């Protein structure tokens, strides 16, 4: 991974394109296989050191076949970078991670299945079918309007389902829902996640 290699060589915090970190030395075979597997046409990485020994890397990929990122697009990313970096440092300031230890090491095919099962079963029988659907779409990053459109319900109904599921699961935010989901995924042995 060119980003990881660059980070190991001292890549500083910031917004970096693949071309910048590879400095024109990217293996064409790696590029072909990576982009064919992901469907991405271009990649940009946000390098976010959050504390000693912990650096987050957030990758954004372009799926359409337009030209490379424009200077304006990169400038906008660089403009929001300080805020994103600050929020990440605030979120990950703890010295100990909050994620549980995995009980299994799934291969790539079973990992996809495990993620799908975990999404469909997060919250267990505490949630209604519709609340589980809303939770699954929240975990996929959809906003209220997109969830409403996907489920054929109103925005207010989505907000009510979100409020109820957060209350039932004692959550206060999407970040807490995501943390709950990750722990659910990590601690359930592959194939043992029960979908209500």
Swiss-Prot record:
Q: Which Gene3D superfamilies would you find in this protein's record?
A: Winged helix-like DNA-binding domain superfamily/Winged helix DNA-binding domain
InterPro entries associated with the record: Sig_transdc_resp-reg_C-effctor, Tscrpt_reg_LuxR_C, WH-like_DNA-bd_sf
Q: Which UniProt keywords apply?
A: DNA-binding, Transcription, Transcription regulation
Where does this protein have coiled-coil stretches?
A: none
Which top-rank group of organisms is this from?
Bacteria
DNA bind region: 144-163
Gene Ontology biological process terms from the UniProt entry: regulation of DNA-templated transcription
Protein name according to UniProt: Putative HTH-type transcriptional regulator in exeN 3'region
The keyword DNA-binding appears for this protein: yes
């Amino acid at each position: 991974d060119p980003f990881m290699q660059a980070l190991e060589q001292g890549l500083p915090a910031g917004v970096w394109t693949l071309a910048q970190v590879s400095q024109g030395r990217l293996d064409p075979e790696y590029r072909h296989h990576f982009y064919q597997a992901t469907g991405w046409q271009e990649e940009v990485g946000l390098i976010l050191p959050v504390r000693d020994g912990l650096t987050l890397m957030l990758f954004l990929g372009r799926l359409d076949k337009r030209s490379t990122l424009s200077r304006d697009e990169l400038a906008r990313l660089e403009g929001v970078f300080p805020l994103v970096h600050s929020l990440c440092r605030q979120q990950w300031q703890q010295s100990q991670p909050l994620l549980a230890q995995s009980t299994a090491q799934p291969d790539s095919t079973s990992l996809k299945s495990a993620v799908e099962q975990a999404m469909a079963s997060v919250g267990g029988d505490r949630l209604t079918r519709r609340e589980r659907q809303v939770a699954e779409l929240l975990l996929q990053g959809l906003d209220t309007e997109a969830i409403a459109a996907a489920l054929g319900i109103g925005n207010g109904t989505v907000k009510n389902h979100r409020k109820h599921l957060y209350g039932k699961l004692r959550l206060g935010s999407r970040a807490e829902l995501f943390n709950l989901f990750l722990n659910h995924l990590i601690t359930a042995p592959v194939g043992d996640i029960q979908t209500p």
